[in-house]
Amino acid sequence: MRRIAVMGAAGRMGKTLIEAVQQTSGAGLTAAIDRPDSSLVGADAGELAALGRIGVLLSDDLAKVADEFDVLIDFTHPSVTLKNLAFCRKHGKAMIIGTTGFTVEEKQLLAEAGKDIPIVFAANFSVGVNLSLKLLDMAARVLGDDVDIEIIEAHHRHKVDAPSGTALRMGEVVANALGRDLQEVAVYGREGQTGARDRKTIGFATVRAGDVVGDHTVLFAAEGERLEITHKASSRMTFAKGAVRAALWLDGREPGLYDMQDVLELR
């Protein structure tokens, strides 16, 4: 059995991850961690996820459960994830990282840690989203510079980063396929007298409202026709199941920084 720890276990995504682990053959939740000031520390992780008691108590310190897991799943905040990354690197623990909002420099730290431990880092662990990335690469290469490209994403009102990590990853895939640098061609929102659109740019539009789990559309607009590639998530479980799948896939892997394209053999 693959022994899995969940960081941020008392949060919305954390509870979904607990449920996904418990539903997956070959995986077992052996540790659950949340922030030290959480009033839920000491509670049964199964009860937090409405599964009933499973005998795993919520801890407030990763070090306290260091001997109880093989791989840590972390969907939290960059500052928290980087601290956990240093711990896992020191103690030889594999990691699944679904945290978004990293800077370029922080992503380099993930790559450095990948020299010592196996890591799967992805902006989105959904199988559908990762298939969409493959389709986006194909579409961008075929349509080339003959279309305007816009990325529209929507999430729930509690999401703290914008654009979403998934939207940015979609932009990176499209830009790479076209031989462009996303940092140079991205346009984040428009207002006022913007002038005519530069076809070389890739636009981003963000919606934050209600309880939207995650919608992403990439629009390729030409004269007389347009192509839209859309993915809509209706439950966080799709991300959680993908993360657990990645955790099982990492078993026995050499150190390295992998992503879901590797897990799904889409390369």
From Swiss-Prot:
InterPro entries xref list: DapB_C (IPR022663), DapB_N (IPR000846), DapB_N_CS (IPR022664), DHDPR_bac (IPR023940), NAD(P)-bd_dom_sf (IPR036291)
The record's similarity note reads: Belongs to the DapB family.
What's an example of a GO molecular-function annotation for this chain? 4-hydroxy-tetrahydrodipicolinate reductase
Which GO cellular component term is one of those annotated? Answer: cytosol
Which catalytic residues are annotated?
H155, K159
The family database entries (NCBIfam families) matched by this protein are listed as:
dapB
Q: Keyword set for this entry?
A: Amino-acid biosynthesis, Cytoplasm, Diaminopimelate biosynthesis, Lysine biosynthesis, NAD, NADP, Oxidoreductase
Kindly list the positions annotated as binding NADP(+).
R35
What's its top-level EC category?
A: oxidoreductase
Where found? Cytoplasm
Which CDD domains does this entry report, sorted A to Z? Answer: DHDPR_N
Designated name of the protein: 4-hydroxy-tetrahydrodipicolinate reductase
Q: Name one Pfam family in it.
A: DapB_C
Which Gene3D superfamilies is this protein grouped with? Answer: Dihydrodipicolinate Reductase, domain 2 (3.30.360.10), NAD(P)-binding Rossmann-like Domain (3.40.50.720)
Q: What does this protein do?
A: Catalyzes the conversion of 4-hydroxy-tetrahydrodipicolinate (HTPA) to tetrahydrodipicolinate.
* Residues involved in (S)-2,3,4,5-tetrahydrodipicolinate binding: H156, G165, T166
Tell me the domain of life: Bacteria
Return the EC number.
Answer: 1.17.1.8
**Example of a GO biological process term:** diaminopimelate biosynthetic process
Q: Where mainly found?
A: cytoplasm
Q: Which reaction does it catalyse?
A: (S)-2,3,4,5-tetrahydrodipicolinate + NAD(+) + H2O = (2S,4S)-4-hydroxy-2,3,4,5-tetrahydrodipicolinate + NADH + H(+); (S)-2,3,4,5-tetrahydrodipicolinate + NADP(+) + H2O = (2S,4S)-4-hydroxy-2,3,4,5-tetrahydrodipicolinate + NADPH + H(+)
Q: In which pathway does it act?
A: Amino-acid biosynthesis; L-lysine biosynthesis via DAP pathway; (S)-tetrahydrodipicolinate from L-aspartate: step 4/4
